[in-house]
Amino acid sequence: MFIVAVLMLAFLIFVHELGHFIIARICGVKVEVFSIGFGKKLWFFKLFGTQFALSLIPLGGYVKLKGMDKEENEENKINQANDSYAQKSPFQKLWILFGGAFFNFLFAVLVYFFLALSGEKVLLPVIGGLEKNALEAGLLKGDRILSINHQKIASFREIREIVARSQGELILEIERNNQILEKRLTPKIVAVISESNDPNEIIKYKIIGIKPDMQKMGVVSYSVFQAFEKALSRFKEGVVLIVDSLRRLIMGSASVKELSGVIGIVGALSHANSVSMLLLFGAFLSINLGILNLLPIPALDGAQMLGVVFKNIFHIALPTPIQNALWLVGVGFLVFVMFLGLFNDITRLL
C-alpha cells in the first residue's frame, strides 16, 4: 500500500498541473514545459510543442507558460505572440492560475460522486446507546430512525448533519418491532473546549443523546441527483475543515506540531484498507492541495493571482527584482514548512 500511496500523491500533483495545462491551452497559451517534480529532468519527451518531463525532486510540479516569466518586459517579442500568457486578459490569467486548484476540487467532487453512486458503506441509523434526553423522549436501543422532520435518513451520519442545522423541536419517525412510531425531542447544546485547550475557543454543537450501533453496517445507493448532492456536501465539509485548521494554525490556537509532511501523508494514505478509503483520503488531500495553492504566499498560485489583480485592476506592479526576491522568500518559507512537517513525522515515528 505504501507504493500505492506514493503514486496517489504523485497523481494529485499531476491533476493540479493538468488543470493549469488544460486551462492554458483553452485560453490559447502555449505550454512549453509540463513537469512532475522539480530540479533535473530525469526523463522527458516532446509532444505538440510541449516538453513533458519527470524531474528529480517529486515534491510538486510545474508548467512553464510561454511569456509568463518575461511578462514584465513589454518590449520582448515573445510577449507579442497571440499564444503568449502576457497577451491574455486579466480574467484569462486568473482562470489559468486558478486552473490547478479547480482541477483538484473537481477531482474530489468526482470521487465523492462516483463512490456515492456505486454504493456507500455506512453505519445504519440504528440506536446502539442512549442518554437521558433521548430516553425521556421515548427512544430505545435498537430503534431505527427513518426520518427527522420528514427528511428520510439512510445513515447515522445524516442524523448528525440534520441535527446540526436544526431549529427547535425535532420530529423523529422510527421503526420498532415492525411498527412505525413518532417521537419528539429538542436537541441540547453542548459546549467543549477545542483540542488546542484554549478556553477562549469554545466549540458548540447540538446532540440528541443517541449513539450508533457499530455492528449495524449497510450499503446505501443514491440516485444521480442524490449522489451529486452528497458529493457537494462532502466537498463543503472538507473545505470547512481545512480552512478552519489553517485559521487555527495562523491564529496560534493550533500547534505547529500538528503539521505533517510527506512521510505523514503517505503513511496515512498507506493505512487505507480498501480502494474506497484510499480514494476518500485522496479526495480530501486533493482539496487540501487546492486550498493551500490558493494561499497568498509568493511562489504559490494565490500570490500570482493577487499580483494579476493588483496590476490590472489597481494598476500596482512591483519591480521585477522585488518580485524575484519575494518569490525566493516564498520558496524558502515553503521549504521550511516542508522540513518542519518532515521533522514532526520523524518525531512521531521515534
From Swiss-Prot:
Ranges for domain PDZ: 108-177
GO molecular function: metal ion binding; metalloendopeptidase activity
InterPro entries: PDZ_sf (IPR036034), Pept_M50_Zn (IPR004387), Peptidase_M50 (IPR008915)
Enzyme class: hydrolase
Keywords on record: Cell inner membrane, Cell membrane, Hydrolase, Membrane, Metal-binding, Metalloprotease, Protease, Transmembrane, Transmembrane helix, Zinc
A single GO cellular-component term on record: plasma membrane
Record's bilayer topology term: Multi-pass membrane protein
Disulfide pairings: none
Cofactors required: Zn(2+)
Locations listed in the record: Cell inner membrane
Sequence positions that bind Zn(2+): 16, 20
Keyword Transcription part of the UniProt annotation: no
EC numbers: 3.4.24.-
Primary localisation category: membrane
One GO BP: proteolysis
Transmembrane segments: 43-63, 94-114, 249-269, 277-297, 326-346
Family annotation (Pfam families): Peptidase_M50
Gene3D superfamilies noted in UniProt: 2.30.42.10
NCBIfam families linked to this entry: RIP metalloprotease RseP (TIGR00054)
Family the UniProt entry places it in: Belongs to the peptidase M50B family.
Protein name listed in UniProt: Putative zinc metalloprotease jhp_0242
Organism of provenance: Helicobacter pylori (strain J99 / ATCC 700824)
